[in-house]
Amino acid sequence: MEVCVDNVDSLINAVQGGASRIELCSALSEGGLTPSFGFLKLAKSLTTIPIHVLIRSRTGDFNYDENDLKIMAEDSKVLVEAGADGIVFGCLDKQANIDVNGCKLILDAVKNNPINLTFHRAFDVVQDPIKTANVIKELGFTRILTSGQVSR
């Protein structure tokens, strides 16, 4: 069972409760944002279960501009180098289709690392989930996090 946490108390409770994987975030009340480097380092010192970090530079939709993508790529690189076992993100265009180029920019930042790649709940707002799932697989993601498109 994966548990999303955005503070140390939640992390400890998740570990003690039997979580098998942690999704580390900040600002879950805002839909989740990228956690700090310090939070990841502390989390890694408190548990040995896999920790995947959310990569999301801001609240709102999943259509990111060039600057957002640069920030997310750099955050991905730094957090993987700091020990993240995986990254969780998703990029869409203005029509709610997968932003392949945006995803590739972030994936390229971590391509030399053996990590897990999860496409997050941006999947829940795409127009064509079957086509999108195939594109996600082709890009190299290993997981899709979804509510079954409840957000649509």
Regions found by a protein language model. Name each.
Residues 8-12, 28-52, 67-70, 92-111, ...:
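Active-site-adjacent beta->alpha loops and helix N-cap segments on the catalytic face
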Residues 1-7, 55-73, 117-128:
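Active-site mouth loops of central-metabolism enzymes
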Residues 1-31:
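N-terminal entry module detector
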Residues 114-152:
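Histidine/lysine/aspartate-rich catalytic loop segments that bind and position anionic ligands
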Residues 16-22, 47-50, 83-86, 111-114, ...:
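Glycine-enriched alpha-helix->loop->beta-strand junction motifs that scaffold or abut catalytic
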Residues 1-5, 22-24, 43, 51-55, ...:
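Hydrophobic faces of well-ordered beta-strands that scaffold small-molecule active sites
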Residues 74-91:
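Ordered, amphipathic secondary-structure segments that act as subunit-interaction surfaces
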Residues 14, 79, 106, 120, ...:
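Conserved, mostly hydrophobic/aromatic
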